[in-house]
């Protein structure tokens, strides 16, 4: 898609800021959808909580990318925080989906997560598999359902089910690196739970690919091609920072430290593979966890 106009909600986050820079470097026009007063003509104002967003602002837009959502690991879970996880995803998606439908925008790329699949244990899953159980799985189901107005309008909707994004600039890796760098990295519980990961570079490339591919729609796993267990990740991360990783944090300690999130996001996992991306011809720059961690630990944060 040459010289496209792309509107992005959530453009200030880890993925959104990297995607904005990559699209502009490729000579696309990026309109940032912001809550504050717009600073220039490349910003569009909205208030998703009140439903305030003028669909006419999207008249000349080729694609909308929605990356809104509070980080699930931002703090210890409570009833109020779990509600904020839902509200920060579902409400903005409803508002944007309706605006896409009203404005006749051709493409909506909407964030989701591999948490959709629940706890897959050793089972390999792809986009053809159904939703799992648990809070995060139901959150993803409701999040994706909120795109229905755009789908019914005839827009091409991509549900970008992202795994753990590996980047030196933020996210899980940046929080964990200080521990691993002094030899305190540890596997969590049994270490047998799977983790679907993707480097930030490939995440951004996959989103650009999804914007440009007219035949790609529906659920698309944005994960590297080789998911690993927590034990394998721990060993690979230690190797990347040249430190041993002999430690294990017992499940009871993980639960004491992280509460409910331990059993939703740390002691269980997804063994998801990117079948839809690979069928469409996408090629990863980082095919293994070693390559992804090498990329993420040798670049400045």
Swiss-Prot record:
A GO term from the CC aspect: peptidoglycan-based cell wall
Pfam families assigned to the protein according to its UniProt record, in alphabetical order: DUF1731, Epimerase
Superkingdom: Bacteria
InterPro entries cross-referenced by the UniProt entry: DUF1731, Epimerase_deHydtase, NAD(P)-bd_dom_sf, SDR39U1
Any Gene Ontology biological process: cholesterol catabolic process
Taxonomic source organism: Mycobacterium tuberculosis (strain ATCC 25618 / H37Rv)
One Gene Ontology molecular-function label: cholest-4-en-3-one 26-monooxygenase activity
Protein known as: Epimerase family protein Rv2216
Gene3D superfamilies xref list: NAD(P)-binding Rossmann-like Domain
Family: Belongs to the NAD(P)-dependent epimerase/dehydratase family. SDR39U1 subfamily.
């Amino acid at each position: 898609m040459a010289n496209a106009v792309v509107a992005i909600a959530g453009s200030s986050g880890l993925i959104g800021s990297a995607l904005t820079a990559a699209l502009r470097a490729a000579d696309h026009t990026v309109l940032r959808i912001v809550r504050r007063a717009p600073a220039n003509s490349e910003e569009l104002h909205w208030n998703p909580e009140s439903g305030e967003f003028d669909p006419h602002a999207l008249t000349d837009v080729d694609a909308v990318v929605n990356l809104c959502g509070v980080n699930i690991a931002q703090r210890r879970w409570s009833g109020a925080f779990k509600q904020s996880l839902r509200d920060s995803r579902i409400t903005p998606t409803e508002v944007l989906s309706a605006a896409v439908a009203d404005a006749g925008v051709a493409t909506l790329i909407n964030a989701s997560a591999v948490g959709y699949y629940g706890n897959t244990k050793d089972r390999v899953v792809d986009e053809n598999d159904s939703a799992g159980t648990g809070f995060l799985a139901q959150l993803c189901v409701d999040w994706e359902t909120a795109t229905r107005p755009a789908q019914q309008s005839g827009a091409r909707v991509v549900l970008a089910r992202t795994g753990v994004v590996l980047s030196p600039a933020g996210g899980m890796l940046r929080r964990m690196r200080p521990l691993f760098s002094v030899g305190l990295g540890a596997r969590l519980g049994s270490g047998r739970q799977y983790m679907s990961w993707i480097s930030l570079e490939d995440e951004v490339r996959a989103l650009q690919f999804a914007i440009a591919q007219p035949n790609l729609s529906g659920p698309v796993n944005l994960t590297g091609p080789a998911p690993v267990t927590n034990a394998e990740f721990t060993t690979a991360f230690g190797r990347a920072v040249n430190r041993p990783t002999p430690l294990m944090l017992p499940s009871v300690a993980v639960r004491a430290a992280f509460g409910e999130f331990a059993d939703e996001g740390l002691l269980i996992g997804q063994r998801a593979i990117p079948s839809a991306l690979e069928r469409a011809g996408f090629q990863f720059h980082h095919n293994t966890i070693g390559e992804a961690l090498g990329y993420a630990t040798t670049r400045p944060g």
